[in-house]
From Swiss-Prot:
Name by which UniProt lists this protein: UDP-N-acetylglucosamine--N-acetylmuramyl-(pentapeptide) pyrophosphoryl-undecaprenol N-acetylglucosamine transferase
Catalytic activity: di-trans,octa-cis-undecaprenyl diphospho-N-acetyl-alpha-D-muramoyl-L-alanyl-D-glutamyl-meso-2,6-diaminopimeloyl-D-alanyl-D-alanine + UDP-N-acetyl-alpha-D-glucosamine = di-trans,octa-cis-undecaprenyl diphospho-[N-acetyl-alpha-D-glucosaminyl-(1->4)]-N-acetyl-alpha-D-muramoyl-L-alanyl-D-glutamyl-meso-2,6-diaminopimeloyl-D-alanyl-D-alanine + UDP + H(+)
Organism: Paraburkholderia xenovorans (strain LB400)
Gene: murG
Domain of life: Bacteria
Record GO biological process: carbohydrate metabolic process; cell division; cell wall organization; lipid glycosylation; peptidoglycan biosynthetic process; regulation of cell shape
GO molecular-function terms, A-Z: UDP-N-acetyl-D-glucosamine:N-acetylmuramoyl-L-alanyl-D-glutamyl-meso-2,6-diaminopimelyl-D-alanyl-D-alanine-diphosphoundecaprenol 4-beta-N-acetylglucosaminlytransferase activity; undecaprenyldiphospho-muramoylpentapeptide beta-N-acetylglucosaminyltransferase activity
Membrane topology classification: Peripheral membrane protein
Binding site for UDP-N-acetyl-alpha-D-glucosamine: 16-18, 128, 164, 192, 250, 295
One cellular component (GO) term of this entry: plasma membrane
Family note: Belongs to the glycosyltransferase 28 family. MurG subfamily.
Amino acid sequence: MTALPQRTLMVMAGGTGGHVFPGLAVAHLMQAWGWKVVWLGNPAGMEATLVPKHGIPMEYVRFGGLRGKGLKTKLMLPLNLLRACTQSLSVLRRVKPDVVLGMGGYITFPAGLMTALSGRPLVLHEQNSIAGLANKVLAKVAKRVLVAFPNALPHGEWTGNPIRAELAGAIAPKARYAQRSGPLNVLVVGGSLGAAALNEVVPRAVALLAPNERPRIVHQAGAKHIEALRENYAAAGLQAGADVELVPFIDDMTSAYANADLVICRSGAMTVSEISAVGVAALFVPFPYAVDDHQTTNAAFLADNGAALVVQQRDLSAETLADWLRSQTRETLAEMAERSRSLAKPDATEQVAQICATVAGSISGASPEGKQ
């Protein structure tokens, strides 16, 4: 039997981990299915360093956003967009992808337009609950429009966010919570850049609790903020190492989530999706300056279903947080975690990959031999 020729997927994603990591999840799965994967990104973006480490070849197009930029950059937009479109078309002609997957980032806009204009199939995925302008435009020319949250785009297919396989494979919340006793386990996640509001409020809130009321705290702060956080806890009368565990970065987020009874964190799209996939109770404090306040809407997907609590940063204080923590029990948090897990889309990676394969004309994404 003659083997079918190897097909090529081109992933367009860049700028932030929220775009890159779900793209990598799909890329790895399709490589396992026998596909060739090429990544289109910006040479100045994090993808230029991260993606090659995963064994995926890169193509580059220079294009950036306008937010926070000066008048000169805004006036140069037409020229920069034209240049990016020309570069994108050149890449498409050279790579000849069977399907292009747009996962977000500024680079997706010119490359997505050229994909559609060149007659190649475009699959678009929106990670947030509120789509940005670029994806709203590209959704009109894409073959399939996929969304992580319901109703993010008109006619979008709800697939969820592609996540790492180990997150979706975590032990069920009911079994995890039932094995525990003693103080609550609270994970505070500030992200790689740290979340100043959490780093300031949480230490003071914990200090307001009596010693027998205090949860076990693991606080991830970001490397640049770890010393300031240590000082915040010290000022609150708490000692790092003895009273709380402070870490600059967490390599194994699956275990960190699974070991927690409660996560206190921002509500970026991937954070919300990962917490739901593992099944853990969450107190979300949305980043107040996110575009279109999309973090509030992301968090609302779980909160509206009794799977999380949302507190706006302006309403977060040491006193209110301490009172809320004092009122929580492992049983109530376990119920919240169960509801969160029930809303997850654990097969999102496979679903997105299969849609890409289908759009490209494959009968099936994978076969027993790992070929198409």
